[in-house]
């Protein structure tokens, strides 16, 4: 039995998330609440911790206070055993400048790698919804002999132009890596599908350090992991693709096996929530064998009074539904829906209140939004467009703390 390698986790969590505005007006994208009890960053942290990778640095920058607080309050590991999940803000260690890209974030944080001296480094994004066992990907990386392994998910070739696409040979060596090509390549075994990058990488430590340092000296680089570092290593013949469909997570169902969602737009964020609410959900939050850990608030259970009901919905702790109807929706903690109100096909974040007789349809309400008695959201889009953001798919998004 071979000795377990020493692995350091680096989570890239500095994303601004402009396409998720107004949800990112006051917080970093990885801190956006999701699924009634979580933040987006909880998915990658849960995957790493479940795989027993317990030394993790989270690189932050943009409006990181709520993210830093969430990690410090909910992701405490045992310091006695040398375990940690620590947020690392941009520190200007190399001069008076902030991170200029994801690769520059690692370059400015090389001291973390030198201090830990790992054999391998997993560099994962912080804003995707999925379950994955990273240890299987690390094993694949070691066996492949590659310098970097890129996690790839298969999508229909016709839909792949929106992503970074991977062209690999039969052995899994990446021949080309192209951002949003007009003609995406097929996979070696299926010309109708394309490997697209999940933004998750496993590096042999020396390979990452050398590539990051070389990139830092390149004045023409954008200092981006996917745009600069990976193509550099592909050109050197050092990159392999890991087929995410081969990843086997304990307790996964046939429906949510290999589930992965990039929730970088309001429509994608909304659709991922709708994946949670059916009787047999596309993504199952209730897998006890590979749990997603989130907020650890001490709240009372949700309560339904005066005939209030919720159908095909997720309702968070501390919420009260009073003589109201909730359907096909995700409600976070401490949400109140008052008498006669109707909530349909919506995502309601913590502390929001829907007043007596109000109607909320096909909408996202951020934290502490108050919809007054008799008010309507998502019913008249022309009226809503004067006040709120509306996605291309017609989802109405109301920013944090707004009173309607």
From Swiss-Prot:
The keyword Lyase does not apply. CDD domains: ADP_Glucose_PP, LbH_G1P_AT_C. It is an enzyme of class 2 (transferase). Its EC number is 2.7.7.27. Gene3D superfamilies: Hexapeptide repeat proteins, Spore Coat Polysaccharide Biosynthesis Protein SpsA, Chain A. Keywords: ATP-binding, Carbohydrate metabolism, Glycogen biosynthesis, Glycogen metabolism, Nucleotide-binding, Nucleotidyltransferase, Transferase. Pathway: Capsule biogenesis; capsule polysaccharide biosynthesis; Glycan biosynthesis; glycogen biosynthesis. One of its GO terms (biological process) is capsule polysaccharide biosynthetic process. One of its GO terms (molecular function) is ATP binding. Alpha-D-glucose 1-phosphate binds at residues 99, 164, 179-180, 197. It catalyses: alpha-D-glucose 1-phosphate + ATP + H(+) = ADP-alpha-D-glucose + diphosphate. Pfam families: Hexapep_GlmU, NTP_transferase. It comes from the Bacteria. Belongs to the bacterial/plant glucose-1-phosphate adenylyltransferase family. Involved in the biosynthesis of ADP-glucose, a building block, required in the biosynthesis of maltose-1-phosphate (M1P) and in the elongation reactions to produce linear alpha-1,4-glucans. Catalyzes the reaction between ATP and alpha-D-glucose 1-phosphate (G1P) to produce pyrophosphate and ADP-Glc. This is Glucose-1-phosphate adenylyltransferase. It comes from Mycobacterium marinum (strain ATCC BAA-535 / M). The gene is glgC.
């Amino acid at each position: 039995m071979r000795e377990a390698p020493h692995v350091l986790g680096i989570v890239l969590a500095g994303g601004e998330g402009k396409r998720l505005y107004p949800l990112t007006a006051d917080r970093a994208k990885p801190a956006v609440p999701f699924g009634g009890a979580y933040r987006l960053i909880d998915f990658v942290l849960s995957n790493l911790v479940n795989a027993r990778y317990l030394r993790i640095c989270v690189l932050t920058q943009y409006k990181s206070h709520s993210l830093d607080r969430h990690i410090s309050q909910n992701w405490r590991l045992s310091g006695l055993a040398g375990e940690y999940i620590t947020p690392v803000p941009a520190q200007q260690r190399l001069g008076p400048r902030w991170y200029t890209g994801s690769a520059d974030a690692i370059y400015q944080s090389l001291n973390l790698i030198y201090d830990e001296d790992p054999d391998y480094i997993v560099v994962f994004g912080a804003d995707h919804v999925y379950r994955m066992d990273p240890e299987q990907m690390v094993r694949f990386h070691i066996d492949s002999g590659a310098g970097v392994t890129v996690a790839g998910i298969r999508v229909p070739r016709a839909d792949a132009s929106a992503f970074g696409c991977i062209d690999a040979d039969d052995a899994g060596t990446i021949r080309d890596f192209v951002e949003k090509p007009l003609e995406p390549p097929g996979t070696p075994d299926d010309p109708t599908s394309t490997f697209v990058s999940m933004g998750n990488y496993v590096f042999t430590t020396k390979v990452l350090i050398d590539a990051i340092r070389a990139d830092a000296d390149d004045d023409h680089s954008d200092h981006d992991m996917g745009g600069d570092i990976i193509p550099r290593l592909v050109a050197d013949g050092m990159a392999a693709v890991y087929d995410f469909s081969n990843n086997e997570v304990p307790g996964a169902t046939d429906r949510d096996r290999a589930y992965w969602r990039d929730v970088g737009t309001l429509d994608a964020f909304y659709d991922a929530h709708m994946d949670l609410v059916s009787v047999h959900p596309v993504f199952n939050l209730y897998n006890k064998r590979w749990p997603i850990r989130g907020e650890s608030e001490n709240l009372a259970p949700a309560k339904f009074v005066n005939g209030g009901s919720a159908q095909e919905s997720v309702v968070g702790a501390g919420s009260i539904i009073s003589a109201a109807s909730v359907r096909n929706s995700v409600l976070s903690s401490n949400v109140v829906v008052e008498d006669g109100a109707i909530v349909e096909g919506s995502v309601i974040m913590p502390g929001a209140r829907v007043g007596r007789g109000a109607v909320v349809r096909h909408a996202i309400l951020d934290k502490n939004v108050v919809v007054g008695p008799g008010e309507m959201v998502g019913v008249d889009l022309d009226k809503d467009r004067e006040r709120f953001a509306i996605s291309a798919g017609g989802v109405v998004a109301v920013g944090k703390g707004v009173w309607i």
